[in-house]
């Protein structure tokens, strides 16, 4: 049967907590004081198998949590990179529904405990010349060339913006970098993640979600400047395949296994992997990387994965 089209809210249902998982063989202990891991989930051959660890943040203890829904974690190592770091690791996240707001948590270990930044939201919905219903889906990109963190986020859903900071806490707004005006017939351009091009020096790549006619796909953009000159090509996209629930979003570039892979979530509720090549000109759907459990805490949905590697162990944060 043809999958029933999902609304953006349906695609985001269940996005009420941030989870953490680690590849099999990693530390099997609590994260942020949460319970021990459940059994590991099967993965695509050649890719790691992840085991659920826990929730890095306790929603009930957060000072800023207007919607009781936290999405799109972006975890970055900041020690020795940003000015006066609060911890060795920063995690950016956000509520989605209005008013949203980009938030920060910090920790000395990737496994926690994670602490909420007392000044959250560090980027509100009304700020630096724009006034929108919400801002959300933060992605942090540390640029060694100028030693600044560039934070990409959306607000409204048709616009992706960028701000930068030397300390990762106080940001300067630059401008919008991507919008639906760049993709005819597409109604959303959001949930972006940015990374250096795997083979071309001085080129940056963006993976983002676009919504042409109710079927969300992953599009590719590129630029020579982090804050401007972004280009999107409608023909370069990753569309949902059979078994993916008719929708895809939340893409992360997978540089391991020789690179050229994209990890993303689908309307099926699982996290999938596809081979796109280092030229982003292929589309080979490989299967499920992480199969969300039907019971708590996943409740049949895992999404927006963010990966960090520490001492040979790969950790996945997700919503």
Locate the predicted segments by residue.
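Secretory targeting signals
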Residues: 1-6, 34
